């Protein structure tokens, strides 16, 4: 398995630099032909959401759709797909940041009964507790 960095994933999704997109696409195709999916870590996914939102000004709904589509791609593997699915589900209808949704979902998968926070938006999500 081969992991990728955020810039490769962003090029794969956005296609704003055709030569770099082609390099990313060929990498995914080559790995798939070898039966080795590309790994997307939680950190890469989190940074990708940030780049799509802050650099490309994509709407939350568009980012949710793009990240959800990645989950359906058999050529890609994810560090913790179940956590990502829960985080995306919670994020789509909340005012909280994707990072908060990912933190809470990951903590719950690791056995935490809650996640303490001072973030008012995060407190509106199930699983966060105020301190």
Describe these PLM feature segments.
Residues 35-36, 96, 112:
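Short, high-confidence coil segments that cap the C-terminus of an alpha-helix
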Residues 42-44, 65-93:
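Acidic catalytic patch
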Residues 44, 83, 102-103, 121-122:
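Alpha-helix capping/helix-boundary segments
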Residues 5, 41, 96-97, 119-120:
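Histidine- and aromatic-rich ligand-binding microenvironments
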Residues 6, 42, 81, 100-101:
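Conserved glycosyltransferase catalytic-site signature
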Residues 104-131:
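Acidic, PIN/NYN-like endoribonuclease modules and their adjacent C-terminal/linker elements
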Residues 1-40, 55-62, 68:
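Short, well-structured N-terminal submotif of metal-dependent ribonuclease cores
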